[in-house]
């Protein structure tokens, strides 16, 4: 794999956090097991398979590589990425991508989704991202990723997965 940028790694339980940050230079992190990334101040080749990104704010050390990442995914015939960012930045980012698209003479397809403090984003039945306001010179949000788990009631803990499924399908509340 091409090593075009520094990547540090931290393993915590069943999750890996990879990326790098240097204030006013570049910030990019991802959790590969969850297929989520945070900020695109630069973009290592190894991060291409990460389809969903969360941008904290619009300083260049956090967004400079966003157009490059979108273009690379298009050139590699990958699905357009989904990029969450502060709602105040959406219109300007759309215009920026249009300008880059004209300069590059190629489309830059992506889903830009606005977020505000207090939003709860359901990525799947179990994976949720909650946003929070951050203090910074520009509009900024922080992200908390968590897994929603519903525990089985004690009387169903010895049942097999098939039995639990059948109970749920019959209308029984097992959690």
Question: PLM features: residue spans?
Answer:
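Short glycine/serine/proline-enriched coil/turn segments at secondary-structure junctions
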Residues: 44-47, 102, 136-138
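Active-site metal-binding motif and surrounding structural segment of the metallo-beta-lactamase
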Residues: 39-88
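Conserved beta-strand hairpin/beta-sheet module of binuclear metal-dependent hydrolase folds
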Residues: 1-48, 142-145, 151
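Active-site neighborhood of divalent metal-dependent phosphoester bond hydrolases
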Residues: 79-81, 88-116
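Short, well-ordered amphipathic alpha-helices
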Residues: 66-72, 93-99, 144-145
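Short solvent-exposed loop/turn micro-motifs enriched in small/polar/acidic residues
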Residues: 20-24, 114, 172
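Generic structural signal for residues in well-ordered beta-strands
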Residues: 15-18, 109-112, 129
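Metal-dependent phosphodiesterase/nuclease catalytic metal-binding core
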Residues: 116-175
């Amino acid at each position: 794999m091409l090593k075009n940028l520094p990547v540090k790694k931290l393993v915590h339980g069943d999750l890996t956090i990879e990326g790098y940050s240097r204030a006013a230079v570049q910030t990019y992190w991802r959790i590969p097991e969850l297929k989520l990334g945070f900020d695109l101040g630069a973009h290592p080749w190894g991060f291409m398979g990460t389809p969903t990104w969360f941008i904290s704010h619009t300083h260049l050390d956090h967004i400079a590589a966003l157009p490059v990442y979108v273009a690379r995914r298009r050139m590699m015939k990958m699905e357009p990425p989904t990029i969450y960012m502060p709602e105040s930045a959406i219109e300007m980012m759309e215009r920026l991508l249009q300008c880059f698209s004209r300069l590059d003479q190629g489309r830059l397809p992506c889903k830009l989704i606005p977020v505000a403090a207090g939003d709860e984003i359901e990525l799947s039945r179990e994976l949720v991202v909650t946003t929070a306001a951050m203090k910074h010179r520009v509009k900024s949000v922080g992200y908390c990723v968590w897994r929603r788990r519903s525990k089985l009631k004690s009387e169903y803990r010895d049942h097999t997965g098939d039995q639990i499924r059948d109970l749920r399908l019959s209308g029984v509340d097992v959690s």
